[in-house]
Amino acid sequence: MKKIIILLFFPLLCQAQEVKRAYYNSGAILSEVHYNIEGKRDGTTKYFYDWGAWAIKTEANYKNGKMIGTFKSYTKDGRIKEEGFYKYTEAGVYSERTGIWKRYYDSGELNTEITYDENGRSVKYISYEKDGTIMPMPEGGC
């Protein structure tokens, strides 16, 4: 019976994480970072605005020290400012943007959509007026 109990908890111990928080001089939270047992970022990392209300400035996901998955940044009033996805490079050395990234005006309307290919290069760029109409591209592209 003791062996069964130990085996049930072993997977949880292998995935143990440590959460580190840093604070502004004012005492408000600055960041919350999850680390795996090897000391590498693993999980959601959040940075906060400095007025003490736990208002998130940015949040990104990490796996084994590398940014991967969803990234979001927010305005001071909590609206999404930018959002997109990161992926590992083939060599696994660094992370790069992939898919569609969106940026928003402070008022919440869509500002730009940038599409990145599998190599992290921007292949499509659309810019919007606040009323949603597409802005014409400047001569020569972006």
Where are these regions (language model features)?
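Basic side chains
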Residues: 2-3, 41
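Sec-dependent N-terminal signal peptides
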Residues: 3-13
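Glycine/tyrosine- and acidic-biased, solvent-exposed loop/turn segments at the edges of beta-strands
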Residues: 15-142
